[in-house]
Curated annotation (Swiss-Prot):
Top-level taxon of the source organism: Eukaryota
Subcellular locations according to the entry: Membrane
Membrane topology: Single-pass membrane protein
GO CC term (a single one): membrane
Main localization (coarse): membrane
Bilayer-crossing regions: 75-95
Other comments on record: Overlaps YLR122C.
UniProtKB keywords: Membrane, Transmembrane, Transmembrane helix
Record-given protein name: Putative uncharacterized protein YLR123C
Length: 109
């Protein structure tokens, strides 16, 4: 009987330590995810559209431009991306916050 109690106590402490380790690993992985997403957080592009447009205009001057349509199309694409970028970042950050809060709410046993 005493031997069974010792074995039971030892087993329960092993289970407790495993649960504690699992909880710690869970919290650690969530923390790492949060930090990495913060580091890679969507920042507004440093290079502004007008800078790109001016640089493109210098490279693609009227007399040496291989294709005016290509120049206009490329600038339109850059313009669209830079206008939509902050909205995309906002959506991405909202999804990240919801995922982070959900992962924190999960109980690990």
């Amino acid at each position: 009987m005493i031997m069974q109690k010792r074995l039971l106590n030892r087993n329960s402490s092993v289970v407790k330590s495993r649960n504690c380790l699992a909880r710690h690993q869970h919290e650690s992985s969530i923390s790492k995810l949060h930090v990495s997403l913060r580091l890679h957080r969507c920042l507004r592009p440093i290079v502004r559209f007008d800078f790109l447009h001016n640089a493109g205009s210098k490279v693609c001057s009227q007399n040496s431009c291989p294709s005016p349509q290509l120049h206009v199309g490329t600038m339109a694409l850059f313009h669209t991306v830079f206008i939509l970028w902050p909205h995309f970042c906002g959506i991405l950050w909202t999804v990240h916050e919801k995922l982070y809060n959900y992962l924190l709410s999960i109980e690990v046993y």
